């Protein structure tokens, strides 16, 4: 990990947590691993701790105990979590484990029997109880004032906003429903209240996340069956779009009702960005069937065409798995051909690997490692070519960008087509004096590479 647990993983957050403890105030450290959804869990825990009088330590040695929020999605992530726990134990000695890997307490205590407690994902109260047992709180209501938006581990100008927990799908390669349970959507009033506090605190971009964002609210038993209330994500998106910030949707399944979001994205007068992050995973129907995925590749091409017809500037991001058990060369070639036709804007790819507890482990005809690597290389070569062509087409255009960071070499920015950390950047290397993170500025694009753009202020 790092010597500074609150910095988290560099691919998720770069904001430094200040050491602002008063004399005698108990201090807790936090190490957060995994996806943005786990990051939001860490933020909630830290917010609760601050409300109860704890300070957040910027290092192991200054903390009286350390919380490690783990990831258990892949075997490699489990090993990383065990290493982070071991590092925290060696550096501090008092460690509380939570998160997805906490659903397997014996796995953790077998490797690290001296941890103080192990709790599962979203078990905030249990985490707080463990902290109380290790380090009693010392609240001072006249001093311990929280910022209205809570404690955030991302830069101040953007924030992840989790709208639901759990997932009702049963994809064979995924164990998240086993760890996080069935879909449980947050009340829209609670989501909007948090969103308003974030925007009021200076957040310029809200990144909407859950396991299945487009299914938001379908678990509500008393919802109406007509209009926006049939699919509450439509009403929520409409309300979020009025707050004056960029609103970016992640983890969206290509359900038919998603098409109803597109006119809202096409309207430049509101904040819902023309951007969809959709995990298609594959394109061959037989592979999708073996994955138990709730989508068909032929229909998704029709949906993509409809989205682009109604919103020509929409950005489509997706991730795929190559080397899934039973994947033949012909099935993989179908995926490559599908990419040629779909022409997605942002494309990621993973090589399949077994995950303890996943049903896909028992499938026949696992693909050899060297074949998976070859297919990944060929996939990424095509994805890179598509990306480069799309970015070259943007040279000469004028667009609004959000400034993420500024140093002596220039400003690193993002367009509406770029989510933080996972997509590309737009760099300004001239005339950037006076820019600060969170600024929204207009640039003219004058250069492009495979994944990034360069531009100048207009």
Curated annotation (Swiss-Prot):
Domain MTTase N-terminal: 26-136
Tagged with keyword Kinase: no
Organism, as annotated: Jannaschia sp. (strain CCS1)
Gene transcribed to yield this protein: rimO
SMART domains hit by this protein: Elp3
UniProt subcellular location: Cytoplasm
GO cellular component, as recorded: cytosol
InterPro entries xref list: Elp3/MiaA/NifB-like_rSAM (IPR006638), Methylthiotransferase (IPR005839), Methylthiotransferase_N (IPR013848), Methylthiotransferase_N_sf (IPR038135), NA-bd_OB-fold (IPR012340), Ribosomal_uS12_MeSTrfase_RimO (IPR005840), rSAM (IPR007197), rSAM_horseshoe (IPR023404)
UniProt remark on cofactor binding: Binds 2 [4Fe-4S] clusters. One cluster is coordinated with 3 cysteines and an exchangeable S-adenosyl-L-methionine.
Residues in TRAM domain copies: 392-458
EC number, UniProt record: 2.8.4.4
Cofactor or coenzyme needed: [4Fe-4S] cluster
Domain of life the protein comes from: Bacteria
Family: Belongs to the methylthiotransferase family. RimO subfamily.
GO biological process, one term: tRNA modification
Name of the top EC class for this enzyme: transferase
Purpose of the protein: Catalyzes the methylthiolation of an aspartic acid residue of ribosomal protein uS12.
Lineage: Bacteria, Pseudomonadati, Pseudomonadota, Alphaproteobacteria, Rhodobacterales
Keyword annotations of the record: 4Fe-4S, Cytoplasm, Iron, Iron-sulfur, Metal-binding, S-adenosyl-L-methionine, Transferase
Start and end residues of each Radical SAM core domain: 153-389
Example of a GO MF term: aspartic acid methylthiotransferase activity
Protein name in the entry: Ribosomal protein uS12 methylthiotransferase RimO
Binding-site positions, [4Fe-4S] cluster 1: 35, 71, 100
Keyword Iron attributed: yes
Reaction it catalyzes: L-aspartate(89)-[ribosomal protein uS12]-hydrogen + (sulfur carrier)-SH + AH2 + 2 S-adenosyl-L-methionine = 3-methylsulfanyl-L-aspartate(89)-[ribosomal protein uS12]-hydrogen + (sulfur carrier)-H + 5'-deoxyadenosine + L-methionine + A + S-adenosyl-L-homocysteine + 2 H(+)
Positions with a binding annotation for [4Fe-4S] cluster 2: 167, 171, 174
